[in-house]
Amino acid sequence: MPRSARVRTLLLGLLGAVALVAVPLTQTASATPEQSYETSVFNNTNVQRVKYDRVKLKGSRCLDGFAERHAKRMATERRMYHQQLGPILKACNLSMVGENVAYGYPNGRAAVTAWMKSPGHKANILNTKYRLIAVGAYQDKDGRWYVAQVFGRSA
C-alpha cells in the first residue's frame, strides 16, 4: 500500500475512534432541577462577590452534604429554619461557618437577589473571610423550593 494511502487509512481510523468516544459524551444526562437551582445560586453568589470586589468562593464537598441534607429536611418538614452550625465547623475542619436559608423562590437567581436585599444575608454573601460555599436545593411536594447556602473558611 502506498504511503499516502496508509496515512489516509490511519487518519480515517483515528477520526472514527474520536467519533466513537465523542458520541457517549454528548448523550450524558442533563442536570437535575436541584442541580440547576444549586448551580444558579452558586454562580449568582459569585457574581455578587465579584461585583463588590470579593474573591470568588469555591465549592466544598464537606459543606455540600450539610447544605443538601438541610434543604431536603426543610422541604420535607415544609418549614424554613437554620441548622446547627457547630457540627459543620467540626466535621469540615472550619474556623468559621455561616448560612443563608430561603424558600419559595422560583430559581437560584431570585433567591440570591432577595438575600442581597437583606442586610444580614448580604453580609454573609459578601463576608471577606469566607472562602468556601455549598448550596442545597430541594422542592416540597407542592413544588416550592427550599434552599440552604452554607459558607465556610478552613481552619
Which residue stretches match the model-derived regions?
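Functional surface patches built around histidine and acidic residues
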Residues: 2-14, 21-155
